[in-house]
């Protein structure tokens, strides 16, 4: 479950390769997500029903997940991740320095960034219990994201082609957020015993050093070459066939 069909955007070879990797080492859907203090954040059912809610809204016609979908609205994975990181940075800045992140010195910012990177990259999924455990302050950052997305789908966004009252049920909004959180978690969390995320460090996110792997870079180059070669071969075929195609005269009247 939670498999995504690849769209027609971007490089098909890269998407196919990344998709294969995700399928082979796909991120676990946890039984539940809890805080270190034991507070329940999301359940497996929340995540699964959240995907259904996203699909019922239009799915890949309304933004994308892991890069698969339309680009009118944001990629929800990348958007959620970026906002959650910013929220976590500010929460830690206030905890350690009693200032907002923007008010910190360069060395203080570097310290906070290092802490946040470790928080997001560290895999806290327990394979025995199926539970993901997150820090209490990270849950506070998640709550900030929930407020933002509630506003997006209740009040609409013209720039995203999302009309007002797209989602009005608070429970549906909560479950949609559960699904997007899970997608973001998979995109930022390293696989167990590996130094690469479940989505091969996609999306690119400098705030936690989520950068393309060497394999991704190589396949990007290969896919571009294949794409250009394919276009060239099609153009050559068309040029050689021109004048050889039999053109039939069409009747003047519709029979």
Can you annotate each of these PLM segments?
Residues 1-42:
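Post-cleavage N-terminal segment of exported redox proteins
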Residues 2-5, 210-226, 250-255:
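Hydrophobic alpha-helical transmembrane segments of multi-pass integral membrane proteins
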Residues 10, 217-239:
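Selective detector of the "anchor" transmembrane alpha-helix that sits immediately C-terminal
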Residues 25-218:
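Soluble extramembrane regions of membrane proteins in the secretory/endomembrane system
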Residues 229-255:
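Juxtamembrane interface at the cytosolic side of transmembrane helices
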